[in-house]
């Protein structure tokens, strides 16, 4: 536009014609400007002006306009104006400018421009001419407008009209013509441009806010038009100039300020005049020069503003006010010699020389809560901030309301002209001015500028992020690649010996400028000044640029000349830890790992080195060892890691290396020395060993193992921190690898420890209680040693001895550490480690009680647990699992049979011991002891439980942890790999990681996958418990999905993964169940008990899943993190049972979740709380004992898949975050709660009630079951209504879970009828569950749906409920396990849908499966949704093979319903097995489908054959085969599942 206008002007358009042009054009051009002037077409020019310019008071308008328009149309016209101004400035008379302006404008133009110029003049006169221009412009405009546009003058807005292009044109002319107003010519001269100021003002007003750009640009034609501009009165012309400029031009109308003063005042814009006090009288020209001190009065700056303030564009939003140089205060001004209130004016001036408004920056008002009230005024196109100075403040003011605004280029051009805009200036000053009225009415103006302020973003401070070389010969000349930030021109790279000493040697490195880049450099190392050093010298590298020096000084080492021979050796040896001279050494020394590592490193020095490096440097090195380890997958590597712990340990480890027990033995040996020397360090050192071992077992794990090593070497907090970093790195790798292996557990463990730190503190206390006396521990251990002697005599002996010593040491150290460690996170980890060690010791002891296999494994696991807890239970479990799987696999089958018997007896012994220990340990024991209980339940289970114990101990302290324990105490066992990892350390943090990695980890084999899922689910549960947030639970679901997928279907991975994991969870439960009764343990643990034996068994029967499970269980037992246990999901079940059985549940209730049936019964006998806790896994056969503990509620929960999820959730939610978990577990919680103890049990009881009848409860305590059933029925009835609500919206399930735990109870509690009603109500919810999606959302509700079935299962007596229960029961166990997520309600894990539901989802509802699988709604429920009867069949589909071999085996061990609960993991009965059928051999092995024989009689079948049943050649496998075929048939009959499906459907 400006150019157009200029062309028009040059075309000698009459003022009128331009005006017409202007009005029309401006209207067209500046529709936005027609805000207020929409009415004035004639004022089109005015309309063109921005709204602010026109209607708002000039200063405001001007300011606003300016700020907005500075770059806009106003900007363009102003350039023209600027030119005019420039000419006028040269003329050095405003009048001249004015006249030129007027002259150039024809009358028409003038009218518009007059309006503008008037406005401008007014503006110039009053600092806020723009606004005041309205008045002035009204008058002037009226005249002018009359000349040009009658209508334009009619409105003050005419003034604004004037600003349109014409005005700009006129303005520039006017500036020239301004000569009429000689007054301002000088000032105008001073201003960058006289008209520019006026233009600026107006323009800024209109331009900033509007799209007046075009009009302004039109105005630009002003220069051309100038010649033709008519001259107006000085005032008028000034005003016009000012107005025109300011109207369309940039805000800053420099020139026209003074000239227009009169106009300004006369313009109705009194506001402006008075505002600024810049009336012609008051308001001096902004570009005028005024003294700082006069007549005894002085305006001085007390505090100067900051030297750099990044100005902002109007569109950027505020960057805040200008601060002082401390960044804590604001520039402060004081007026001395005057005691009357005055107005302080602040504007942005140029950076040097005579003060005048800045051409590129404007002041802007900053508003805030506590800022000083101020107002913006537009003077001569420049925004001025006015603040009151008051005597009350001693005439001192901290100016906290002034920011700096950067004008758009268009505004700048409009303001100072195109020529002026080329001279970029990024520095400005704040100019402070006061106008003091003398007694005679005259005004004294004082003005003082601040120091210059740089208004651009400063160059970033350089940083070095990474360098390619850490050490070099003293000769230098090697190239170093530096990666970093902000390497700008002028960068220097300095090598300095002592950075803090400026006089120390320093040298500038030569930079390769050809490859110089902003974020990377290549420099040559300068030679060191002393070429004859004999020891490495550490210097610092930093980068210096104009912006300063890099904050972080990178260490660099000059090594002696290679001639000395030290350099090369050092570099090579220390490559992984080049920081040998650095503080890492201390950490290493503290670790005492160097010597040990070397010894143990026999096989893998790299691994040793990595642990040694445990500092940041080690990080890199660790990664390599991890890779190596994964490749080698050899126990020596882990041993190497273990070596880090202690020389003795190394020896023990080496001896252990010979056999699978070696891992546990190294752990034990490691524990004892480290415990004595440094308990804190010991757990950490321990961890590395465990990790290493795990890595050996799982290829993926090796990556994790170094981290574990590092964490195990936590002895020094520095080392620990460094290792933690390493861990995290490994964690990432771990997860990837773990997805196929138990490595996942490791990474999760890493996170878990942090989450569990507080729990760890508690745990530290608990461990002492748990292990009340070393004597008892040693007794247990000796017993274990004897038992272990059977399976792993050699390794067991060393491991258990170490364990006993460790237990004693750990107890002592833990007590000490508990006091010390509790205070610090490091301490927490140490406590956790110690706790784990204790737990592991207990579990070891328990293992001794349990069959030799378990004891041996436990010994190894136990040893690891200490390591694992601090470092990562995960890796330990993985190690154990792998070791067990590889070494023990062969032994496992042989030993398993032997050990099964031993396990049964030892399990009973362990359970007894556990009970006694639990009782003695009290809360701490109950928390910590659940692992002991698990140990009793089964070796594998004990490790899992141990970690749950940790969780539990932690959980009791924090409710979240409690929930985790409850839900997860079993899940950790189940998780095996992941659970153990996540249980203690990472339970809370990576629920998803848990689940996902377990999937991958277990994914190695079908069995392994099932385990993974299991571990994932349980890990998630553990995580949830630990984290106390439900996030992990959500992950849990996915993991379950994977489990289910692995077992049955890919689709079920989403929702089914939950179910799948549910199956695995069942396995976990079976672990609980196992513990529950020696039988169940024996069967579950037969694979589990002999770690090697169980492993072989698991591996063969279960395939990877169970095989892993066994090792996992063992690992879990030893690790106490269910990491490996989880992979051996079914073992995990035993472990879970153990966990629940341990006293931990009593205190924490949540830990009880995984008590074995026996333990549950004991717990029930011992404590209702334990029962409740146990109830989590009690749900099915194993669960039933748990349920007995937790009452019928738990069973009900487990019986039905929904109950399972409820149970899981309730376990978590009840104990820890029932409310939080409620959403997820609410139905479970509610169910569990009602029957269970009033507190957690209210929530948990109903869930468990349902579960309990499911399996274990029935066999374990018929009376309890009946009671539970009754409670359930009552609760169901009560809750049915609630539950109907709950179920009414499956999502509500989560809601309900969070909102009401009792309603969830209802959900679970309801027996068949209540369940049916609830389910009916829920049907949509559960049906949705069937549609995996709702299940994902609710997860819990899904479990709830099958609850009626669960209730039926609970009460063998009630046939109707039982049949539904049967179907439900199968699925329910899975669900239950899944839900064992920690208190994280958020993730309310309805993870454990009944397998039937899962199968239904898979087979019947592939699509729903996806939706539902995440939720894993009860199998029955899902089938019910699908076809009422289908649920069992779908379940079968999910767990096709599960029902046959594995589950039967698991259940068979328990023989009784209790055992079934042990099988609970895959409590899918027939359906479950069908689900597993996908790979009958593999899936059953993996999932060990807990199909209870596949018949509605879940209880009868509840003695699910060992999870490994298929792989294992037990009667269970036969049953599983039958079940499988039955399941297949059922799958075919999915829609018409009768025995289970009918009831389920009815319930549904």
Swiss-Prot record:
Residue numbers bearing the N6-acetyllysine modification: 139
Main localisation: nucleus
Annotated region described as Disordered, given as residue ranges: 54-106, 141-180, 192-237, 258-282, 659-682, 750-777, 851-892, 970-1010, 1097-1127, 1257-1388
Ranges annotated as biased composition (Polar residues): 141-151, 258-277, 766-777, 851-860, 876-886, 1113-1127, 1284-1300, 1308-1333, 1349-1388
Post-translational modification Phosphoserine, affected residues: 137, 151, 172, 577
Entry comment on modification after translation: Phosphorylated. Phosphorylated at Thr-152 by CDK5 in response to osmotic stress; this phosphorylation mediates its rapid nuclear localization. Poly-ADP-ribosylated by PARP1 in response to DNA damage, promoting recruitment to sites of R-loop-associated DNA damage.
Sequence ranges of Basic residues compositional bias: 217-229
Domain RHD: 281-460
Keyword Transcription among record annotations: yes
Compartments reported by the entry: Nucleus; Cytoplasm; Chromosome
Cross-linked sites for Glycyl lysine isopeptide (Lys-Gly) (interchain with G-Cter in SUMO1): 572
Residues modified as Phosphothreonine: 152
InterPro entries cross-referenced by the UniProt entry: Ig-like_fold, Ig_E-set, IPT_dom, NFAT, NFAT5_RHD_DNA-bd, p53-like_TF_DNA-bd_sf, RHD_dimer, RHD_DNA_bind_dom
GO molecular function: chromatin binding; DNA binding; DNA-binding transcription activator activity, RNA polymerase II-specific; DNA-binding transcription factor activity, RNA polymerase II-specific; RNA polymerase II cis-regulatory region sequence-specific DNA binding; sequence-specific double-stranded DNA binding
Keyword Nucleus applies: yes
Cross-link Glycyl lysine isopeptide (Lys-Gly) (interchain with G-Cter in SUMO2) mapped to chain: 572, 619
Record keywords, A-Z: Acetylation, Activator, ADP-ribosylation, Chromosome, Cytoplasm, DNA damage, DNA-binding, Isopeptide bond, Nucleus, Phosphoprotein, Transcription, Transcription regulation, Ubl conjugation
DNA-binding region location: 310-317
Role noted for this protein: Transcription factor involved, among others, in the transcriptional regulation of osmoprotective and inflammatory genes. Binds the DNA consensus sequence 5'-[ACT][AG]TGGAAA[CAT]A[TA][ATC][CA][ATG][GT][GAC][CG][CT]-3'. Mediates the transcriptional response to hypertonicity. Positively regulates the transcription of LCN2 and S100A4 genes; optimal transactivation of these genes requires the presence of DDX5/DDX17. Also involved in the DNA damage response by preventing formation of R-loops; R-loops are composed of a DNA:RNA hybrid and the associated non-template single-stranded DNA.
Quaternary structure, from the entry: Homodimer when bound to DNA, completely encircles its DNA target. Interacts with CIDEC; this interaction is direct and retains NFAT5 in the cytoplasm. Does not bind with Fos and Jun transcription factors. Interacts with DDX5 and DDX17; this interaction leads to DDX5/DDX17 recruitment to LNC2 and S100A4 promoters and NFAT5-mediated DDX5/DDX17-enhanced transactivation.
Protein's UniProt name: Nuclear factor of activated T-cells 5
């Amino acid at each position: 536009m400006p150019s157009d206008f200029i062309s028009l002007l040059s075309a000698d358009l009459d003022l009128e014609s331009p005006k017409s042009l202007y009005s029309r054009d401006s209207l067209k051009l500046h529709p936005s400007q027609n805000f207020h002037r929409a009415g004035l077409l004639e004022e089109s020019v005015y309309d063109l002006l921005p709204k602010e310019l026109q209607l708002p008071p000039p200063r405001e308008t001007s300011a606003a306009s300016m700020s907005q328009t500075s770059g806009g149309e106003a900007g363009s016209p102003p350039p023209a104006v600027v030119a005019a101004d420039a000419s006028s400035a040269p003329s050095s008379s405003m009048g001249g400018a004015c006249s030129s302006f007027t002259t150039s404008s024809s009358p028409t133009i003038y009218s518009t421009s007059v309006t503008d110029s008037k406005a401008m003049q007014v503006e110039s006169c009053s600092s806020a001419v723009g606004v005041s221009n309205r008045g002035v412009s009204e008058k002037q405009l009226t005249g002018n407008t009359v000349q040009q546009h009658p209508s334009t003058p009619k409105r003050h807005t005419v003034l604004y009209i004037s600003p349109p292009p014409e005005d700009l044109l006129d303005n520039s002319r006017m500036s020239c013509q301004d000569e009429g107003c000689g007054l301002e010519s000088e000032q105008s001269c001073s201003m960058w441009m006289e008209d520019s100021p006026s233009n600026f003002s107006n323009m800024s007003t209109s331009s900033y806010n509007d799209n007046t750009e075009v009009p302004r640009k039109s105005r630009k034609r002003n220069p051309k038009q100038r010649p033709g501009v008519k001259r107006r009165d000085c005032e008028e012309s000034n005003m016009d100039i000012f107005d025109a400029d300011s109207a369309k031009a940039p805000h800053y109308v420099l020139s026209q300020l003074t000239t227009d003063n009169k106009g300004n005042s006369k313009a109705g814009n009194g506001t402006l005049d008075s505002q600024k006090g810049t009336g012609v009288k008051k308001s001096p020209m902004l570009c005028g020069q005024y003294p700082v001190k006069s007549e005894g009065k002085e305006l001085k700056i007390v505090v100067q503003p900051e030297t750099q303030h990044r100005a902002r564009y109007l569109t950027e939003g505020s960057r805040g006010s200008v601060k002082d140089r401390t960044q804590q205060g604001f520039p402060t001004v004081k007026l001395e010699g005057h005691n009357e209130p005055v107005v302080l004016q602040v504007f942005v001036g140029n950076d040097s020389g005579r003060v005048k408004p800045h051409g590129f920056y404007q002041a802007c008002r900053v508003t805030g809560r506590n800022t000083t009230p101020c107002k913006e005024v537009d003077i001569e196109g420049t925004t001025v901030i006015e603040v009151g100075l008051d005597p009350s403040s001693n005439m001192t003011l901290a100016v906290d309301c002034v920011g700096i605004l950067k004008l758009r280029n268009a505004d700048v051009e409009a303001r100072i002209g195109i020529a002026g805009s080329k001279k970029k200036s990024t520095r400005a000053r704040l100019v402070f001015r006061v106008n003091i009225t003398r007694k005679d009415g005259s005004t004294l103006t004082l003005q003082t500028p601040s120091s210059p302020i740089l208004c651009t973003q400063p160059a970033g401070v350089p940083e070095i992020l990474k360098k390619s070389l850490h050490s070099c010969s003293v000769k230098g000349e090697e190239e170093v690649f530096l990666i970093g930030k902000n390497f700008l021109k002028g960068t220097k790279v300095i090598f300095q010996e002592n950075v803090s000493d400026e006089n120390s040697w320093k040298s500038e490195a030569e930079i390769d400028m050809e490859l110089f880049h902003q974020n990377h450099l290549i420099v040559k190392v300068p030679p060191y000044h002393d070429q004859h050093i004999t020891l490495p010298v550490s210097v610092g590298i930093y980068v210096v640029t104009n912006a300063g020096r890099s904050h972080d000084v990178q260490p660099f080492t000059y090594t002696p000349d290679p001639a000395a021979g030290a350099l090369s050796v050092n570099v090579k040896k220390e490559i992984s830890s080049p920081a040998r001279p650095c503080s890492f050494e201390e950490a290493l020394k503290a670790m005492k790992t160097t010597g040990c590592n070397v010894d143990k490193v026999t096989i893998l020095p790299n691994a040793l080195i990595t642990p040694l490096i445990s500092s940041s440097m080690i990080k890199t090195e660790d990664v390599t060892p991890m890779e190596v380890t994964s490749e080698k997958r050899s126990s020596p590597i882990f041993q190497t890691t273990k070596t880090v712990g202690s020389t003795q340990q190394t020896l023990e480890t080496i001896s252990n290396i010979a056999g699978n027990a070696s891992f546990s033995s190294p752990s034990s040996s490691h524990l004892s020395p480290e415990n004595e020397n440094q308990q804190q360090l010991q757990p950490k050192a321990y961890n590395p060993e465990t990790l290493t071992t795990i890595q050996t077992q799982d290829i993926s794990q090796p990556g994790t193992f170094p981290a574990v090593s590092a964490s195990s070497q936590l002895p020094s907090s520095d080392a620990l921190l460094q290792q933690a970093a390493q861990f995290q790195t490994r964690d990432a790798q771990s997860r990837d690898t773990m997805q196929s292996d138990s490595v996942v557990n490791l990474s999760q463990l890493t996170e878990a420890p942090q989450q569990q730190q507080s729990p760890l503190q508690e745990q530290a206390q608990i461990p002492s209680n748990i292990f009340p006396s070393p004597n008892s521990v040693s007794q247990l251990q000796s017993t274990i040693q004897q038992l272990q002697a059977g399976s792993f005599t050699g390794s067991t002996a060393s491991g258990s001895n170490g364990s006993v010593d460790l237990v004693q040491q750990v107890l002592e150290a833990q007590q000490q550490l508990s006091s010390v460690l509790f205070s610090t996170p490091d301490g927490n980890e140490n406590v956790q480690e110690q706790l784990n060690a204790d737990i592991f010791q207990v579990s070891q002891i328990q293992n001794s009680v349990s069959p030799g296999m378990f004891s041996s494994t436990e010994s190894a696991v136990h040893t690891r647990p200490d390591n694992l807890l601090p470092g990562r239970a995960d890796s330990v479990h993985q190690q154990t699992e792998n070791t067990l799987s590889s070494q023990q696999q062969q032994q496992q089958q042989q030993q398993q049979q032997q050990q099964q018997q031993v396990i049964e007896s030892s399990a009973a012994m362990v359970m007894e011991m556990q009970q006694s220990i639990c009782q003695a340990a009290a809360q701490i024991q109950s928390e910590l002891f659940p692992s002991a209980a698990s140990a009793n339940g089964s070796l594998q289970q004990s490790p899992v439980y141990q970690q749950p114990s940790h969780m539990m101990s932690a959980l009791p302290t924090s409710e979240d942890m409690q929930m985790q324990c409850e839900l997860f105490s079993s899940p950790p066992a189940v998780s095996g790999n992941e659970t153990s990892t996540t249980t203690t350390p990472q339970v809370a943090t990576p629920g998803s990681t848990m689940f996902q990695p377990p999937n991958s980890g277990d994914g190695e084999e079908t069995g392994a996958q099932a385990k993974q899922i299991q571990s994932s689910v349980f890990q998630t549960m553990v995580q949830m418990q630990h984290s106390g947030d439900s996030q992990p639970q959500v992950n849990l679901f996915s993991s379950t999905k994977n489990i289910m997928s692995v077992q049955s279907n890919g689709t079920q991975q989403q929702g089914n993964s939950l179910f799948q994991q549910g199956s695995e969870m069942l396995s976990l439960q079976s672990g609980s169940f196992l513990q529950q009764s020696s039988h169940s343990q024996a069967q579950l643990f037969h694979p589990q008990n002999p770690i090697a034996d169980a492993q072989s068994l698991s591996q063969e029967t279960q395939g990877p899943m169970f095989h892993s499970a066994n090792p996992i269980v063992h690992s879990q037992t030893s690790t106490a993190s269910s990491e490996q246990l989880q992979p051996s999901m079914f073992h995990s079940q035993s472990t879970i049972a153990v966990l629940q059985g341990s006293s931990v549940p009593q205190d924490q209730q949540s830990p009880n979740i995984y008590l074995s049936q026996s333990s549950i019964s004991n717990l029930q006998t011992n404590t209702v709380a334990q029962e409740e806790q146990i109830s989590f896994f009690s749900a099915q056969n194993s669960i039933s004992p748990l349920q007995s503990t937790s009452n019928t509620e738990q069973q009900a929960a487990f019986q039905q898949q929904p109950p399972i999820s409820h149970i899981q959730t309730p376990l978590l939610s009840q104990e820890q975050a029932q409310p939080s978990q409620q959403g997820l577990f609410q139905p479970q919680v509610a169910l569990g709660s009602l029957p269970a103890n009033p507190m957690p049990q209210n929530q948990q009881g109903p869930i468990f009630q349902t579960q309990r009848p499911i399996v274990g409860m029935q066999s374990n305590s018929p009376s309890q079951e009946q009671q539970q059933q009754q409670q359930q029925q009552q609760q169901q009835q009560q809750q049915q209504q609630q539950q109907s609500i709950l179920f009414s919206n499956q999502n509500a399930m989560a809601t309900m879970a969070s909102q009401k735990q009792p309603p969830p109870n209802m959900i679970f509690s309801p027996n068949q009828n209540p369940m049916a009603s609830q389910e009916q109500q829920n049907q949509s919810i559960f049906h949705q569950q069937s549609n995996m999606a709702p299940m994902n959302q609710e997860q819990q509700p899904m479990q709830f749906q099958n609850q009626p079935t669960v209730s039926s299962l609970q009460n063998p007596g009630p046939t109707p409920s039982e049949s539904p229960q049967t179907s439900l029961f199968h699925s329910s166990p899975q669900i239950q396990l899944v839900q064992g997520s920690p208190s994280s309600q958020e993730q309310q894990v309805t993870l454990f849908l009944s397998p039937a539901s899962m199968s239904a989802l898979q087979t019947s509802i592939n699509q729903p499966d996806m939706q539902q699988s995440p939720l894993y709604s009860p199998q029955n429920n899902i089938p019910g949704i699908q076809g009422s009867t289908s649920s069992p069949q779908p379940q079968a589909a999910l767990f096709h093979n599960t029902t046959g071999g594995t589950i039967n085996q698991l259940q068979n061990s328990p023989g009784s319903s209790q055992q079934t609960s042990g099988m609970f993991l895959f409590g899918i009965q027939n359906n479950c097995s069908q689900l597993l059928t996908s790979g009958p051999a593999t899936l059953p092995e993996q999932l060990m489908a807990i199909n209870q024989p596949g018949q509605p009689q879940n209880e009868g079948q509840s003695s699910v054959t060992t999870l490994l049943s298929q792989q294992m050649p037990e009667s269970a496998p036969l049953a599983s085969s039958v079940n499988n075929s039955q399941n297949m048939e059922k799958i075919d009959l999915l829609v018409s599942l009768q025995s289970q499906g009918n009831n389920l459907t009815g319930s549904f």
